[in-house]
Amino acid sequence: MTKKYDLHCHSTASDGVLSPTELVHRAYAQGVNVLALCDHDTIAGIDEAEIAAKEVGIELITGVEISTNWEGRGIHIVGLNFDKTHPKMTALLQSQKALREKRAVEIGDKLEKAGIPNAYDGAKALADGEVTRAHYARYLVQIGKVSNDGQAFKRYLGQGKSAFVKAEWADIPTAIETIHAAGGIAIIAHPLRYNMTGKWVRKLIVDFKAWGGDGMEMADCGQTKDQRQMLARWAKEFDLQGSVGSDFHFPCGWIELGKNLDLVDSVIPVWEKF
């Protein structure tokens, strides 16, 4: 039987809406055999997910999505199959947590100046862990300032908007080095979703490979066949393995755990390293 993999999803430990247990149960219902919980800069949900995975018979891979800065842009690096207790990983995630909290407070201050008081407290009430921009977006929807999360980013939270705060995340080499030190595999998350031209995506891949990166996500729920073929060509050129991930945050019509996550045949799957 061919296994179904989903190696990128989120829980309430970061900006997802399902608890780790609920997420695992949903993955099981969708026929996923191997799952990686990759919350933003935290592994706080993994212990709970491991218990649920054993109950339903899913293989759970340790994962995290590390926020980094590259060429003035935010780029996410997924770590897979690493030692979650490794001191270097623990130290990096603690540092990232402090940076995220600092940014969250600053976003709240900017929203207050924009005439939206107590936004930090409102966002925090919606968070089960660290406060992210997604929690602010949900709060702005809740109080009627915007009609949906996307509008919150376009009006307040996105780059160049009144409540945007640039975070000074780790750089990509630090993320890769930390993942490798913990025995894991470093992956570029959703390389075609950074609003960059093909030239810039290729430059990102060149730098990532030069710094020792292992692979990139090459299948998500919404990619076209042409996009997957393009990523497959780059994977071959730079000797990178392919990962797959829905980047599931909440139930919706167009993104689902395990949905449409097939690698191009020529790509070497990252799970061969597991």
UniProtKB/Swiss-Prot annotation:
Gene3D superfamilies, A to Z: 1.10.150.650, Metal-dependent hydrolases
Binding site for Mn(2+) 3: 65, 76, 190
Extent of the signal sequence: none
InterPro entries: PHP_dom, PHP_domain, Pol/His_phosphatase_N, Pol/histidinol_Pase-like
CDD domains (UniProt xref): PHP_HisPPase_AMP
Catalytic EC class: hydrolase
Reaction equation(s) it catalyzes: a ribonucleoside 3',5'-bisphosphate + H2O = a ribonucleoside 5'-phosphate + phosphate
Enzyme Commission designation: 3.1.13.-, 3.1.3.97
SUPFAM superfamilies per UniProt: PHP domain-like (SSF89550)
Stated family: Belongs to the PHP family. TrpH/YciV subfamily.
Function, in words: Efficiently catalyzes the hydrolysis of the 3'-phosphate from 3',5'-bis-phosphonucleotides as well as the successive hydrolysis of 5'-phosphomononucleotides from the 5'-end of short pieces of RNA and DNA, with no specificity toward the identity of the nucleotide base. Is more efficient at hydrolyzing RNA oligonucleotides than DNA oligonucleotides. This enzyme can also hydrolyze annealed DNA duplexes, albeit at a catalytic efficiency lower than that of the corresponding single-stranded oligonucleotides.
Protein name: 5'-3' exoribonuclease
